[in-house]
Regions:
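C-terminal effector-binding regulatory domain of bacterial HTH transcription factors
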Residues: 1-5, 71, 89, 123-126, ...
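Short beta-strand-centered segments that line the small-molecule binding cleft or hinge
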Residues: 3-5, 75, 93, 115-119, ...
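Short helix-boundary/capping micro-motifs
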Residues: 15-36, 59
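N-terminal winged-helix
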Residues: 34-35, 39, 95-124, 128-141, ...
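A short LG(V/I)-centered, amphipathic sequence patch enriched
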Residues: 45-67
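Hydrophobic hinge/microswitch elements
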Residues: 109, 135-148, 154, 205-263
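Secondary-structure junction motif
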Residues: 112, 154-155, 177, 183-184, ...
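Flexible hinge/capping segments at coil-to-helix
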Residues: 162-199
Length: 309
């Protein structure tokens, strides 16, 4: 091996290149010139003695060795960030943390995420947060790749291995219809009855949609939605504007507030419910910000309609 020893900045440049998949954009994200970023990555390749990046006229991807180096880079950078948070916490006698927390959230849990981030903000006002709407599969992948710090997702529907978790609420479902719909005043509606309505649903890549599809199958129904979207807000808008019906979590309107001319009717036969909670990679030591997020999740009061039984 030759050249000066590897440093954190080189790993940050490498992580930025993986994220942006473009040398110039990666350099801009790191606030350096493109030649500087490219040169430091070449130095890293020389230091490790392996090619990391496949180069052509533009960024092509990572070599097999580069994929392994990138995984280690993410691990080292995450540990470096956790160390900085730990030292900051030791210096700050008030117990209030600072830093950046990235949260991945399944679309149906975005209103609940607002309650949790409010609790974090109340207890740690200097913490900056990024909240991203993601599928449950993307949340687990991004946690493993250190792209996010914590996720808010389903705990009991599809396997989550190697994760620590904290259950927050039970997701139950209702049929959302316009107030002039014949079912708007019903006390409840069966899944078989809901299947007969013109539906708008989340896209099939969303775990919420897979849950809903299974519920319909258990009621011997297989509706074909008129519209699909990856946004729960868009579902509500299409119920209000187009007169479609949709299936959403019962708690949603309780947190977001009533929507004009829209009614939520509980779904039954079968009763479907799933646990939703906070997840993070199960490792030791745990970063102070992740611990703070879990502590705030524990004290966050879910809406009465979705509290854990």
């Amino acid at each position: 091996m030759a050249g000066r020893p590897m440093d954190i900045r080189q790993l940050q440049y490498l992580a930025a290149l993986a994220r942006e998949k473009h040398f110039t954009r990666a350099a801009q994200a790191c606030h350096v010139t493109q030649p500087t970023l490219s040169g430091r990555i070449r130095q890293l390749e020389q230091e490790l003695g392996v090619p990391i990046v496949e180069r052509g006229q533009r960024f092509v991807g990572f070599t097999p060795d580069g994929v392994r180096v990138l995984k280690w880079a993410h691990t080292i950078l995450d540990n470096w960030s956790s160390l900085q948070q730990e030292i900051e916490a030791l210096r700050n006698t008030s117990g209030s943390l600072s830093g950046h927390l990235s949260v991945g959230v399944i679309p149906s849990a975005l209103p609940m995420a607002g309650l949790i981030t409010k609790a974090i903000r109340d207890h740690h006002p200097a913490v900056e947060m990024t909240v991203l709407s993601q599928s449950s599969i993307d949340i687990l992948r991004n946690l493993e790749d250190f792209a996010i710090d914590v996720g808010l997702t389903y705990l009991d529907n599809e396997p989550i291995e190697g994760m620590r978790s904290e259950a927050i609420y039970m997701e139950r479902y209702c049929l959302l219809v316009r107030s002039d719909h014949p079912l708007a005043r019903a006390s409840s509606v069966t899944w078989a009855e809901a299947a007969k309505e013109p539906l708008c649903l989340l896209t099939p890549d969303m775990q919420n949609r897979r849950i809903i599809d299974r519920a319909f199958r258990s009621a011997n129904s297989a509706p074909v939605p008129r519209l699909e979207t990856n946004s729960v807000i868009n579902l509500c808008a299409n119920v209000h504007l187009m007169g479609l019906a949709s299936v959403i979590p019962e708690y949603f309107l309780e947190v977001m507030g009533p929507i004009s001319d829209v009614r939520a009717v509980p779904l039954s036969d079968p009763l479907v419910e799933h646990s939703v909670g906070l997840v993070a990679v199960d490792r030791d030591p745990v970063s102070p910000l992740v611990l703070a997020a879990f502590a705030c999740a524990k004290i966050t009061e879910p809406p009465a309609i979705s509290r854990r039984s």
